[in-house]
Amino acid sequence: MVENKRPAAGGAQTVEYPIICPYCFNQAAGGRPFSHKDVHFRAETVYPNLHAIEQMMGKRKVDIEMMTNTKEQAAAMSQFEAAERFLQKDDPVYNRFWSDYNSTSEQESRMDNGIKPWTRPVIRYGDGVSRLVTDSDGFVVAAVDNFGKTTHRRVCPHCHNPLPLGFGKNPVKNISIIGITGAGKTVYISQLLKGMVDYAAKSGLAAFFTSDHESNFIAANQVAKGKPLPDSTLPNSLSQPMFYDIIQSNGSSKKTDTIVLYDIAGENCRSAADMVRFARFIEHSDGLILLIDPKQLNFTSDCDEENVDAPSLALNTLHGVITGQQGRKCTIPMAVCVSKSDQCFDILPSMAQEHIQVARRNEMGVIAKEFDGSAYNQLSQEMTRLIENNALSVCNILQDNYLNFNFFAVSAIGCDCTKNENGVFAPSMKPEPRRIEEPILWLFKQFGFIRSNTKVLRPYPIKQPDKEVWKPGFLGIGGKYVRVEGELARYEEEKIRETVIREGGR
């Protein structure tokens, strides 16, 4: 995460709005942030070919070259060459990034006027841009090109991928959503995005999307009665990151954080070799959501024998990517989620609860910024027992390699699906998602956006390092430190110490 700072008062030198690209993470610059003033832009001025430039100028290039007045020829040729800077063409920098993922997943919008956005000329201040435009806080939001047209299409200077509205102005948290094969990740993300504004509101936050990627994802992966369920994410392909801003209001003040969601196919997590192209997104994650099909945990009678080892493989691969070494635990908070949990009502009674995360108002009528820990703890304990009884190896890997995790059960559809005449499954009634917001609200608690209405139980207590407690000598004369065995941290709110601490003494 990069903490973005406004310019300090009194002219003090600070890092002004440092930006880490959500696509390439500035790998070309060794991961160093770039300034908001160094962003590049996709131009609004676009000439599809040389003929269009000649039409604009009223002269052919060959006619300019044959002009006899040297001064007029130089001026005309300078104008022509300036326009050539705005020719529509393939962008080798952009294409180089997407060559790792077969092809780009960026889509055209109505605002593109039939021009593929990644073929627009990329310009920057001093090279096609005559003036930068800032907002009231001095943050660069647009640019005026050499032909007087204003563009708001900011792109990363290293990979030329689009930066959404206001990206880089506020602190950023990255969340990777990883779906083991068959877990229904695409359906889960579509339903989560569809309800995100309401889910945030129920926890006292405001949320709004800052790009087209979110609505494009929902439109391309619709979940509705009688509509075939969307296809799973193709291995080795990369969906566009999805962006939204989370606003915390406190009286007259507001704090904004940007959330970036990454869609990672579980097929890319089976081995380190498969993860090479996606490692950058996992490594830069501030939170993880791992979706597992209940069949892969032996929760149902028709267990998935072929992929029963997939959760263990994914957990081991993720640990290797994040820590890079054995013996070191991953500290990134991870929500381990059993999907399709409506199939498990008989063994998960908490899933049958109708109302989870009900908005609670304080004495002033303001919705409390909180996670419903009291409702969650019951589910967490049920989940821990079930996974221990049915997939102990998964529990062992989590305890050995992950410090901050918890169990969740979600259902993105919440109703039966029937197979149509083409052999494709579709919801048989209006989908009713259950508890799909809980993992991300738990991450919001981890990030400090909200608190819990009660202490949240860890799935397994963590033994704290020992203490050295001061024991006074006889009659209070002298004394010594006596080592006392570390206590068990049963709740997430209890901070885990890294070393032995001393208490008391002189």
Give names to the regions the model predicted.
Residues P164-G168, V197-P235:
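Flexible phosphate/Mg2+-sensing switch loops adjacent to catalytic phosphate-binding sites
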Residues M1-G166:
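Long, basic/Gly/Ser/Thr-rich N-terminal segments
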Residues G184-K185, A375-L386, G414-S452:
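Conserved GTPase G-domain signal focused on the G5
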Residues F25-A28, A265-N268, P294-N298, S341-C344, ...:
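Conserved nucleotide-binding/hydrolysis micro-motifs of P-loop NTPases
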Residues S249, S253-T256, V276-N401:
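Conserved C-terminal guanine-recognition region of P-loop GTPase G domains, centered on the G4
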Residues K173-Y199:
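Glycine-rich phosphate-binding P-loop
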Residues K255-V276:
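Switch II (G3) loop of P-loop NTPases
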Residues I397-T418:
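Beta-strand-loop-alpha "switch" segments that mediate conformational coupling across diverse proteins
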